[in-house]
Amino acid sequence: MKNYQFSTALLSSQIQGKKLRFPCPAKINLFLYITSQRPDGYHELQTLFQFLNFGDWLSIEIRTDGKIILTSEIPHLKNEDNLIYRAAKLLQQKTGCTLGANLHLDKILPIGGGVGGGSSNAATALVALNYLWNTQLSLSTLAEIGLQLGADVPVFVYGKAAFAEGVGEKLTFCQPPQKWFLVLKPETSISTAIIFKDPNLPRNTPKRPLAELLITKYENDCEKVVLNHYSEVEEALGWLLQYAPARLTGTGACVFAEFANEQAAQSAFLDKPEKYVGFVAQGTNISPLHQMIEYLSQQKQTLCLPNNTNSRG
């Protein structure tokens, strides 16, 4: 896996080019508790999302003909089914914007790892195109569009670390400690259907206020069930636990260990077995995507936008 982190230098060095590259940050679930199962089968939860300064890159170049042209490094996925393409089309439909875009995804995050890659890609497309096309939708409106693409898309749209409740739609922004993490992807993919159908999955963890959860040991209710079904995840987690507190993110397959500083995380990373892909990154309570949008706004960059093309419909 390509191993570099987002930074201001990486963001600022590209500004003079015709294309802009926007970060699609990973996320981790610092904790995840399942509090109930609704009659419709959906599970209610309490979870804490934090972004990482590591992820995919989405390159964007504006077109004047309204076409959305996407190239990516994801095999066997039609563009029409890609969340990036769908996000761009939904934004056009919502705003009546007549501009288009050339989009290229530099895929770095592991697919199916539970670190939010697809949701982050969709959110970056929405937020970045809203900025570049000057469609001026609010984040709440973009989040509503994003919810059509996936339950986790809104948290990436808002770009702040968040405590999520319900089925993930109730968000409370917060500021957990920004630690360093070593994230590993075992050589397996998780079936969420298998996990959520397992009778041993906890479904009645008592709801607790955020203030209490933040000072309690963080756990993931899905972890034991995932480990029972996937020995590869159990092995990877066991390896991480030699170095630091570690657990599953989401339903996996990625697992992560938390460290107080980068040096300790990098030291463990150097010992990583070759069969694991992984990366070291710092948690951040403000999404690198939103940091870049803010940077562009502060620099007052003059983007080559055609005149009179912003139609709100």
UniProtKB/Swiss-Prot annotation:
An annotated Gene Ontology molecular function: ATP binding
- Enzyme Commission number(s) from the entry: 2.7.1.148
| Keyword Acetylation on entry | no
Do you know which Pfam families this protein is assigned to? GHMP_kinases_C (PF08544), GHMP_kinases_N (PF00288)
Its BP terms in the Gene Ontology are: isopentenyl diphosphate biosynthetic process, methylerythritol 4-phosphate pathway; terpenoid biosynthetic process
Membrane-spanning intervals of the chain: none
Q: Which catalysed reactions does the entry list for this protein?
A: 4-CDP-2-C-methyl-D-erythritol + ATP = 4-CDP-2-C-methyl-D-erythritol 2-phosphate + ADP + H(+)
Top-level enzyme category: transferase
Q: Which pathway is this protein engaged in?
A: Isoprenoid biosynthesis; isopentenyl diphosphate biosynthesis via DXP pathway; isopentenyl diphosphate from 1-deoxy-D-xylulose 5-phosphate: step 3/6
Where on this chain does ATP bind?
P110, I111, G112, G113, G114, V115, G116, G117, G118, S119, S120
Q: Where is the active site?
A: K27, D152
Q: Which PANTHER family match?
A: 4-DIPHOSPHOCYTIDYL-2-C-METHYL-D-ERYTHRITOL KINASE, CHLOROPLASTIC (PTHR43527:SF2)
Similarity annotation: Belongs to the GHMP kinase family. IspE subfamily.
What HAMAP family does the database record attribute to this sequence? IspE (MF_00061)
- Protein's name according to its UniProt entry: 4-diphosphocytidyl-2-C-methyl-D-erythritol kinase
Record the organism: Histophilus somni (strain 129Pt)
